[in-house]
């Protein structure tokens, strides 16, 4: 298994473009999965510079509906075959907002206190583009390719990983309520070396999400984690607990990035031996071992 980070807040090599977003290109056997598409078009230009032909993508998956994870797909769609499978989770088209009134340090920098953060497209857009492979999943765990799974329907995290009150969604009656991120999903690749988990933002709590992965794959250790852990706005105690979780886990590669935030990244760099600086241009692959028959727990 090989992954390449196409879009991220930071870049690892000169000539690549950074943006506040995330996009990862995953290669596993014959599968070419694009996990998230960033906010604008950095993933497109970076892919070209990295020698990756996005026309070869065999599937697309969105971690959740915030524009910094799927906005770039608006520019990418024309490259893809019309029947390419595109996976979102149920709730993907619920409108989401960031309420700056719950984030006092930012109030002076925003003229509007409510910022629409997703989704950047409506359901009809996919069909207008002729993308007939789009589908919304409702499964706890669905295999979308050999050894590649999408996991959703995460439990509401406990108070230590509670969703920040600034994250709100539009309820059935039009009122804004706390966002529980019903559409959030992660990608899990079952490799001979262990599980590789790709997250978008881990709004449902990275520790809670990884614990759910362990319950659904009880015989397989988590080897690597890449993606956002949503440790912003920074809470020193939550960051310390998260770093401690990683430090005492089976994880040998912690490519946390994006919404982990500057404070979170600094703590990981200083205290988590498995930490791997991650940004656009990162190429990482698992060692080659013979595969075992162990797999996920059937639910």
Name what the model sees in each region:
Residues 53, 102-107, 242-243, 271-274, ...:
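Short, hinge-like loop/turn segments at secondary-structure boundaries
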Residues 2-50, 180, 184-199:
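Conserved beta-strand hairpin/beta-sheet module of binuclear metal-dependent hydrolase folds
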Residues 16-17, 31-59, 75, 102, ...:
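Pre-active-site segment of Zn-dependent metallo-hydrolases
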Residues 265-266, 274-299:
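Binuclear metal-dependent phosphoesterase catalytic core
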Residues 8-10, 37-40, 65, 90-92, ...:
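Active-site metal-binding loops of divalent metal-dependent hydrolases
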């Amino acid at each position: 298994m090989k992954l390449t980070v196409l879009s991220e807040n930071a870049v690892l090599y000169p000539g690549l473009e950074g943006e506040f977003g995330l996009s990862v290109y995953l290669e596993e056997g014959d599968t070419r999965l694009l996990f998230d598409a960033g906010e604008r078009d950095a993933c497109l230009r970076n892919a070209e510079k990295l020698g990756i032909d996005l026309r070869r993508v065999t599937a697309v998956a969105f971690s959740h509906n915030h524009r910094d994870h799927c906005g770039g797909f608006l520019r990418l769609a024309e490259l893809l075959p019309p029947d390419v499978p595109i996976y979102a989770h149920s709730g993907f088209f619920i409108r989401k907002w960031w309420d700056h009134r719950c984030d006092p340090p930012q109030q002076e920098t925003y003229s509007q206190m409510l910022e629409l953060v997703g989704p950047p497209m409506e359901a009809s857009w996919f069909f207008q583009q002729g993308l007939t492979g789009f589908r919304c999943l409702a499964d706890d765990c669905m295999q979308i390719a050999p050894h590649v799974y999408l996991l959703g329907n995460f439990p509401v995290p406990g108070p230590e990983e509670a969703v920040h009150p600034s994250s709100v969604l539009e309820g059935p009656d039009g009122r804004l309520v706390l966002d529980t991120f019903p559409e959030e999903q992660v990608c899990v690749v079952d490799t001979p070396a262990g599980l590789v988990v790709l997250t978008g933002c881990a709004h449902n709590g990275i520790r809670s999400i990884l614990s759910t992965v362990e319950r659904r794959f009880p015989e397989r250790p988590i080897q690597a984690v890449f993606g956002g852990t949503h440790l912003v706005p920074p809470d020193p105690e939550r960051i310390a607990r998260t770093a401690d979780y990683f430090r005492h886990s089976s994880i040998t590669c912690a490519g946390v990035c994006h919404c982990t935030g500057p404070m979170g990244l600094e703590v990981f760099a200083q205290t988590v031996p498995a930490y791997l600086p991650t940004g656009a241009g990162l190429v990482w692959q698992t060692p080659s071992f013979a595969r075992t028959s162990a797999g996920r727990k059937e639910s």
